[in-house]
Structures are given as C-alpha cells and as structure tokens.
C-alpha cells in the first residue's frame, strides 16, 4: 500500500517552506491578518527569490528542494491544459457518439473552462485564509471523482455538468501554484520562475493532444477521462508527500467572504493591476479561441486525421514553450518586462491579421501549412505575453497573493469561456470566426496594456 505521506500531530500546522526575508506591511483595503504568534520565528535557510548581497535576486536557494517544488508546481499548472487539450482530438468523436452537433460538443469544453474560471475565484481567497495545502488537496480529490463521472456520462448533458465540476475542482491546482510562487519569489526572480514554470507546464499542451490521439487508437473518448483521473490521483499522492505549506499561520487572512471581496475590490481599484489583468485575459482568449476551433478547422476543413492534428498542435505548443524560455533565460533582467510584453502582443497581433487574410480568401485557397505557420507565430507570441502579464500583476500584490492569483485566473478563463463559442458561430466549414476572434481579443489586450498600464511612465 502506498504511503500517503508524513503524518503531523494535530496540534501542529503543515510544514512551512522558508519565506522571503520580508513582506510589505500594507494590505488591500479591508483585509485583515491573523494575529502573529508570540515570540521570534526561527530563521531558516535563504529562500528562493531573496535578495542576494549584491542586490540581485538569489534564484537557487536549496537546489534540490527548488527543483522538486518546480516539478510539483509545474504539474499542478499543467492540469488545466491537460484537462482541455487531451480531450481535443476526441471532440468530433464525442459529437458523433452522443448524436449532437459540433457546437454542442464544444460546450463540454466551455463548461470545463467556465469551471476553471469560477473555481479559482473561490479557491484563491480560501488559500489566503486556510493555507495552500488543504484547499489544494480538497480540490484534487474532487477532480478525480469528476473525471470518473465524465468517463461514464450517458449523455452530453451529463458530460457537460461533470466537465463543469472537473473544471471547478481542477482550478485549485493552477491558482494555488501561482500563489505558492508569490509566497517564495519576488521581482525578477518571480518572472524567471514563471518562465521556468511555463517550460514544465508547457509540456502538457505539447503532449496532451498527442496522448489523446494515441488513446483514441485503443479506446474511445471515455478512456481519456479515466487517464485524467489517474493523473489527478498521482498529483494528490505527490502533494501529500512532498509539497510543504508556504503560507505561515501568522500571515494568513482571518476574515471571511466579506473580507475576501474587499480585498479583491482593492486589487481591482489598482489601475495598473487591472490593466495587466485585462491584457492577460484577452491574450488568453485569443489563445483559447485557437484551442477551441483548431480540432474542427484542421480535421473537418482540411481533412487531417486526429494524429496529424495532434502533431500540428504539438508544434505550435513548442513555439509557446520556446519563447517562454527565451523570455525567462535571456530577456528577463536585460529587457524591461513591459517592452517584452508589448512585443509579444504585437507579434501575436500580426499573426492574427495574417490568419484573417488567409482564412477569408484574400490570398485565394491557402493550404494547411501556411495556416499552421500563422498559428505557430501567434502561439509563440503568447510565450512572451502571458508570463510577463502575470508577473507584473503579482508584483503589485504581495499582501494577497491567493486573491490576486484567483482574479488573474478567473478573468483569463472566464473571458476565454465567453470567446470560445464565438469561433463556431458560422458553422464547421470556415475558419474566419477563429481568426476574427483572435484579432479582436489581441486588439483589446493591447488597448488595456497601453491605456491602463501606461508602460512609458514610472510606477509607484
């Protein structure tokens, strides 16, 4: 029998990971803290992200623990793309097996995305109050149960309901992973770690559709959900044994729902934070319009097999991961984050313009290869946009990392859930709606970035 991990006496909190040297004392309006425990806290070894004596961020900390935590957090942030992308090659099969049109089958994808959005809004404040581990483990157990229920769903209505539950539960992984990063890191160290996290979690969208396509060789779409439930079980066992508590009891918020809402209202009142939140959300909408439309565009319009679609999706995801690593390993610390973010938006926007021209027939009949190149450029730009939008927003919110992470994730997935059905409004035989949604979303992201963040001005 597998050992579920170390047991702790009832009177003691979960093990606490060493924190950054200090936190700003200012909280969001209305936020309250639990009273500090009496007596001095024992000094631990330097934590990742602490300022080195020379003034730069110290990224390594305890190397072995840092690598292990990176893998765990990467696995947690990979859960949403796994839940969404591994299912993509099966969408046409779901449509046929349950005797529903493509637009109805796409609603099962939208339901999961909506659950991921709303779930983060709930779990984020809970993690600020109860710590990171308990809400995470509760959500992961519910994710496993929902995955099994999806595998045995008798109708598209039942499948849609349990996909919603699966998204609600899976939200715990991504929102708490971001909050843990904010607990451990600050400044440029956080931006670099987010890019490293993108490398780990970026493997998920690369491998998920390929794995999903291979699963369909041996079983039907129901087998995909059983594998997702098994992945959830593996993550639960790893978290139980290896993920420490990163939010000490004396730094937790003591208020209830009203306090959480006041904290979020204070965050949204910050113009610059709101700008990064909106820019990142609409950039994500452009990305997810590709995720929602590409199975039908590639397989129905261009006649490709599920395996060919999976390979094309993998190539595009590699572009996302590669540019994310370029951001974290080369650009961060050398080029201002706002400049990189702006370039990423411009790069994706130019690709969206080209895609709209190709799909609308301006260049005549365009084959699959030019379309795939345009999508790859668009996805690569996201590798520069998404980590920097999240980093810049979280740098302004050291006092409420869970709530800020929840707002970021909820906004991104909610806007994505609204945008995804729009790609199918003109039916299954045209890719114009996909390109139009992508271009519109990126224009709105750029307007929010320029109008609210005002990157040319000095910040408070």
Ranges and model annotations:
Residues 97-99, 131, 152-158, 169, ...:
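Helix-breaking motifs and short loop linkers at transmembrane-helix boundaries and internal kinks
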Residues 134-149, 339-355:
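Structural signature of the two symmetry-related core transmembrane helices
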Residues 162-201:
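Cytoplasmic helix-loop-helix junction between adjacent transmembrane helices
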Residues 118-157:
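Conserved MFS/SLC helix-loop-helix module at the cytosolic interface between two early adjacent transmembrane helices
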Residues 120-131, 323-338:
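Helix-to-loop junctions at the C-terminal end of transmembrane segments
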Residues 54-62, 244-277:
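Juxtamembrane intracellular "pre-TM" segments in multi-pass secondary transporters
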